Amino acid sequence: MIPPLLVGTRKGLFVLDADAADRWAIRHHAFAGVPVTITAFDPRDRTLYAGLNHGHFGVKLHRSDDQGASWIELPAPAFPTGFPPDEEGKPAPSVSLLWSLEPGAEPGELWAGTIPGALFHSTDRGSSWRLVESLWHEDARRLWFGGGYDAPGIHSILPDPRDRRHLLLGVSCGGVWLSPDAGAHWEIGGAGLVATYMPEQRQEDLAVQDPHRLARCAGAPDRVWRQHHSGVFRSDDGGRNWVRLEGLPLSDFGFAVAAHPDDPDIAWFVPAESDENRAPSNGRMGVTRTRDGGRSFELLGDGLPPPPAFDLVYRHGLAVAPDGRRLAIGSTTGGLWASVDGGGSWRLADARLPPIASLQFAA
């Protein structure tokens, strides 16, 4: 069975289904006119979650128990009333964007990452939230800063499938953080990374690194892939140490990365042009794939737009299904493409969607 595809866009959430001929059609459209920044699917109870950004009216969170046919509003993650600012005279922190959602170890458990860089925890299917103060009060957090946004944010939350209390976080710009005990304690990873946008004497500082996205192989969880602001990296020890990969065609800049769910040597990236243009390199849209652990890369573009293309794929805009062969990419121009052969070829699923922020297979 082909899993539904959740498409978060600037004008709401679309739930798409594919038929046997791989033709995609919209089954549900929710939150029309409202940006949907992130979605989550919990396979244990088949619940969908959607994070919204209402602008003036703030961040909202919704849950669906019927595969997107209807939704109920939940309390969104928020700092406790009276929570102090980082510095006297500064405003108290408040959540401006819900940037990541991930099921936890126990039934009904959820993790949420936000801008500013805060981690929140729920044990009741999102009905209530607790700020993970252990991370917020880490001394190194004061070194974090914004990249594409004014404030830092947590965009990647990767529980270890062997023990989902073990967490790996990606923070832009704040590096990678690991917890062995569901957020009670933290250590910073990232040896081997370099931040070329920093002064030379600070380029190896772990707390100022800018991971654009992290992806973990579920079948071999120590293998983690990283699309960094300053290149593409691989970790073989769960995110503590990293090796920079060379020889990528077009560009080693981009935002999105996906890991094969079973094969630790396969990963996909979507190259772009850094920093000001934020468009496909040389106007050529493609997907970069490695099948040998990053020793070599191939550029895949059959079925994607020819040059000049201006389709940028955001960090949550690349998704892989559990079979490791079905993929989808969505762009800032509202284009959606699907592949059934591991990215070797692509087929246009929809060309008229609003700008796409996130994709996820509900499987």
Enumerate the language-model features and the residues they cover.
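Extracellular glycan-interacting surfaces
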Residues: 1-363
